[in-house]
Amino acid sequence: DDRGETWERLDGNGLPSGFGFALAIHPRDPDTAWVVPEEGAENRVTSDGRLGVYRTRDAGATWDVRPAYDEAWVAILREDGASDWLDPVGVYVGTQSGSIFVSPDEGETWVEAARHLPPVLSVEVAEWQ
């Protein structure tokens, strides 16, 4: 672990493509992350028309998919993923079609929390008291 000094390609190992955005990192476990793979830079739509959030718990060596929504030819931008600091960690993904998907349990299950918003260009999480 060199705090981002060096990088390696992580396509394969369970990911359907080597292109994707909406990367969210677990706030307490740097080996756990979530990403939404997309078909490529030109189309930027979810693989196979399904919104699947892929999770790694071993720093990208392997990935498993958690389906969030079927029949979702949606585009995700670079800053459209976030995680909170709760226990369990909540994970959030926004789409250019105006939906926000939320997982309250570290990516195990997903719900569409909002729809018909303007295009979501960025997702940030703040603690509300």
Language-model-detected regions and their locations in the chain:
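Extracellular glycan-interacting surfaces
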Residues: 1-129
